[in-house]
C-alpha cells in the first residue's frame, strides 16, 4: 500500500451555524490518493492556526529567515468579528491558498500536519439534529461563478446523476428529489447514502434512486473478490428479499462484492446473499462514534424495491444473480482447498518421459584370479604377482 496523500482540495462553500453560537465554517471536498472523496468542515480560525503551525515547521519556506525564499502563501489573520460578508469574500483567498499549498514540494504538500488537518473528524459526520430550532444555512459556491469547483485545485469534477424515482426525505439531513432531477454527487459513502447538491440544496440521497447520465452501468463498482474480506456484523438483519441473507449481531462473514448502493454480497460458509454494508465492520477494527452516527440512519432502500422507476437508458444495469455468486464462490473455495500439484521432484516424475534421467554408471568388473594372471598377463605383471606372494 502506498503512502497517504491528498490529490486535490476544493472549496464547496460555507455554512452559517447557530449552535452553540452563531459562527461560520467552510466546506471542503478532499480527494485522497485512493480516489476517495470526503467532505470536511473547518472554521477560519482553525485554518489560520494550521497556517501558523505550518510556518513554524518550515521557517525557510515561510520566509522567516530570508524573505526571498518564501514559497508558503500568505494568509490574512482573522478579524475580531467575522460576518457573512467576510466569510463570503474570503472564499477566493482560501481557494488560492490551498491551491498554492498543493503545488509545493511534497515535504510540505504531503506533510503529516496537512494530512491530519483534513482527516475526517467525528464532527464532520455529525449531521444536524432534527430537533434543532434553527438549522444551519448553506451557501454553495456557484458552479459558473468566479470560484468554479472544477478550477480550484485541478481535475475535481462532481459527477452528475439523475433521479429515477421520487424520493421523499425522511429527515432534515436528507434531500427530496423528484423523477428526472439532476444532482451533483459530492460524496459516495460505502453505506449507500450519497451526499448530493442540487442548486442551493444539499443532503443525503439513497444511491439506489440515482443513475449516471452517461451509461446505465455503474463503472465504479469493483469486480467481485471471491477470496473474500473478513468482516463482522455489528447489527442483526432479517432478510426481506429472497436474494438477501439473515445474520445476527457478531457473526463473522466474508465480503465478496462491494457495491456502491450500500448492499454488499457476503458469504457465510457456502451461503451468499445481499447484506447492508452499514451493519458491517472490518474484522479487528473498532467502530467509531462517527460511524455509529451514520449507521443510525438505517440501511438505504434497494433498487429492486423502488416502484415506478423510470430510467433514461434502454437497458438496465447489469447485476449478477445470487446463483452466479454462489457457483463462482463454491468453485473458488474448492480450488483453494485442493492440494497443490506435486513438483518436478515427485516420484511421479520418474515415469514422465520428458523428465531428464541421469546416465547409469558402469559396473565394476571382478578381480581376476592368480591362475588367469599367470597365463594371460605380461612377464612384468607375473613377476609382481610372484614377488607379492
From Swiss-Prot:
Cited InterPro entries: NADPH_Oxidase/PX-Domain, NCF1_C, NCF1_PBR/AIR, NCF1_SH3_1, NCF1_SH3_2, P47PHOX, PX_dom, PX_dom_sf
Chief place of localization: cytoplasm
GO molecular function, one term: superoxide-generating NAD(P)H oxidase activity
Leader sequence segment: none
Cellular location(s): Cytoplasm, Cytosol; Membrane
Domain PX: 4-125
Organism superkingdom: Eukaryota
Positions of the UniProt region annotated as Disordered: 292-389
Record-linked PROSITE patterns: PX (PS50195), SH3 (PS50002)
Translocase listed as a keyword: no
Pfam families (alphabetical): NCF1_PBR_AIR, p47_phox_C, PX, SH3_1
Keywords: Cytoplasm, Membrane, Phosphoprotein, Repeat, SH3 domain
Gene3D superfamilies: Phox-like domain, SH3 Domains
Modified residues (Phosphoserine): 304, 321, 329, 346, 349
Transmembrane segments: none
Bilayer topology annotation: Peripheral membrane protein
Residue ranges of domain SH3 in the record: 156-215, 226-285
CDD domains named among the record's database cross-references: PX_p47phox, SH3_p47phox_1, SH3_p47phox_2
GO biological process: cellular defense response; cellular response to glucose stimulus; cellular response to testosterone stimulus; defense response to bacterium; defense response to fungus; defense response to Gram-positive bacterium; epithelial cell proliferation; hydrogen peroxide biosynthetic process
Post-translational modification: Phosphorylated by PRKCD; phosphorylation induces activation of NCF1, leading to assembly and activation of the NADPH oxidase complex.
Skewed-composition ranges (Basic and acidic residues): 373-382
Domain notes: The PX domain mediates interaction with phosphatidylinositol 3,4-bisphosphate and other anionic phospholipids. In the autoinhibited, unphosphorylated state an intramolecular interaction with the C-terminal SH3 domain precludes phospholipid binding and interaction with CYBA. Phosphorylation disrupts the autoinhibited state.
Assembly information from the UniProt record: Component of the phagocyte NADPH oxidase complex composed of an obligatory core heterodimer formed by the membrane proteins CYBA and CYBB and at least the three cytosolic regulatory subunits NCF1/p47-phox, NCF2/p67-phox, and the small GTPase RAC1 or RAC2. Part of a cytosolic complex composed at least by NCF1, NCF2 and NCF4. Interacts (via C-terminus) with NCF2 (via the C-terminal SH3 domain). Interacts with NCF4. Interacts with CYBB. Interacts (via the second SH3 domain) with CYBA; interaction is phosphorylation-dependent. Interacts with NOXA1. Interacts with ADAM15. Interacts with TRAF4.
Protein name: Neutrophil cytosolic factor 1
Amino acid at each position: 500500500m502506498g503512502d497517504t496523500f491528498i490529490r486535490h482540495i476544493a472549496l464547496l462553500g460555507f455554512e452559517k451555524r447557530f449552535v452553540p453560537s452563531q459562527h461560520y465554517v467552510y466546506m471542503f471536498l478532499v480527494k485522497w490518493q485512493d480516489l476517495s472523496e470526503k467532505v470536511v468542515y473547518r472554521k477560519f480560525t482553525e485554518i489560520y492556526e494550521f497556517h501558523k503551525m505550518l510556518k513554524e515547521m518550515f521557517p525557510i519556506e515561510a520566509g522567516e529567515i530570508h524573505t526571498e525564499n518564501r514559497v508558503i502563501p500568505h494568509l490574512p489573520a482573522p478579524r475580531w468579528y467575522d460576518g457573512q460578508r467576510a466569510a463570503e469574500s474570503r472564499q477566493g483567498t482560501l481557494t488560492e491558498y490551498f491551491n498554492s499549498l498543493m503545488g509545493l514540494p511534497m515535504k510540505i504538500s504531503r506533510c503529516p500536519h496537512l494530512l491530519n488537518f483534513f482527516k475526517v473528524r467525528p464532527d464532520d459526520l455529525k449531521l444536524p439534529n432534527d430537533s434543532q430550532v434553527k438549522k444551519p444555512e448553506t451557501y454553495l459556491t456557484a458552479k459558473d461563478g468566479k470560484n468554479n469547483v472544477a478550477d480550484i485545485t485541478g481535475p475535481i469534477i462532481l459527477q452528475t446523476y439523475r433521479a429515477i424515482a421520487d424520493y421523499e426525505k425522511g429527515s432534515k439531513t436528507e434531500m427530496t428529489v423528484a423523477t428526472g432531477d439532476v444532482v451533483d454527487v459530492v460524496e459516495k459513502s460505502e453505506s449507500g447514502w450519497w451526499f448530493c447538491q442540487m442548486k442551493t440544496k444539499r443532503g443525503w440521497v439513497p444511491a439506489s434512486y440515482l443513475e449516471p447520465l452517461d451509461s446505465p452501468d455503474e463503472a465504479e463498482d469493483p469486480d467481485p473478490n471471491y477470496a473474500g474480506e473478513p468482516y463482522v456484523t455489528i447489527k442483526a438483519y432479517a432478510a426481506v428479499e429472497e436474494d438477501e441473507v439473515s445474520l445476527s449481531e457478531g457473526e463473522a462473514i466474508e465480503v465478496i462484492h462491494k457495491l456502491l448502493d450500500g448492499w454488499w454480497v457476503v458469504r457465510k460458509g457456502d451461503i451468499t446473499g445481499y447484506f447492508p454494508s452499514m451493519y458491517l465492520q472490518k474484522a479487528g477494527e473498532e467502530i467509531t462514534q462517527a460511524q455509529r452516527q451514520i449507521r443510525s440512519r438505517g440501511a438505504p432502500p434497494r433498487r429492486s424495491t423502488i416502484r415506478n422507476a423510470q430510467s433514461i437508458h434502454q437497458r438496465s444495469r447489469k447485476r449478477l444473480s445470487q446463483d452466479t455468486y454462489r457457483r463462482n464462490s463454491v468453485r473458488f473455495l474448492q480450488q483453494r482447498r485442493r492440494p497443490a500439484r506435486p513438483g518436478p521432484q515427485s516420484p511421479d516424475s520418474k515415469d514422465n518421459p520428458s523428465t531428464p534421467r541421469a546416465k547409469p554408471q558402469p559396473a565394476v568388473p571382478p578381480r581376476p584370479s592368480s591362475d588367469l594372471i599367470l597365463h594371460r598377463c605380461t612377464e612384468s605383471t607375473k613377476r609382481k604377482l610372484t614377488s607379492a606372494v
